Amino acid sequence: GGTLALAIDPLDGSSNIETNASIGSIFSLLPTDGEAPFSQPGRNQLAAGTIVYGPRCQMILTLGRGTLTFTYTPSFGGFVEEARSAPIPEKTSEFAINASNYRHWDEEVRLYVDDCLAGAEGPRGREFNMRWTASLVAELSRILARGGVFLYPADARRPYRDGRLRQLYEANPVAFIVEQAGGAATDGIRHILDTAPATLHQRTPFVFGSAHEVQRIARYLTDPSAIGERSPLFGRRS
């Protein structure tokens, strides 16, 4: 018995509709203990999921015991489980960010992107590929399938000084799924799931994906000079 609180983004990636690119939905289920069920840490979520309306209609779901992937099968008339998602690889050679916002980012974010784009000749000593679909659910599906990291940092523009994505119904459910798949999700420094949104539409910076790379980004944001390959005491490291 009892009731649950449902937080949902019914149409993620709506700017992709005109171009027939992937869009989707994001949802989160929370307990209703207390007077403000939507103002509790994301770690209290009971379940979270995304649905991608793409070449396949795919649902990714977690109940807090790993991550499941389902595909809508017309002949069956419903969703059929594909498999439990394999753990997200700790390291990656792919990153997703909207590079058109480069001039608005903090210097530390620019430094991370510059180091990746410098490839084998740069301080990372290896090649990276940059991705961007303008669809959070599609980015999540890609990262679950083959690893990678997603960044949507805060920037200097007034509407986005606290980030752009909504914590309650975008960042929290995606972070829950990612952590259940062995990845990491932060606001750049702090774990998203350890913080509670004060309002329904509170924005947050968001970084998620391969745990090793998410941790590296946190070091760029806090003390980039301490990163091994930028220290004169060390050679290149990936």
What are these regions (language model features)?
Residues 1-238:
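IMPase-like, lithium-sensitive Mg2+-dependent phosphomonoesterase catalytic core
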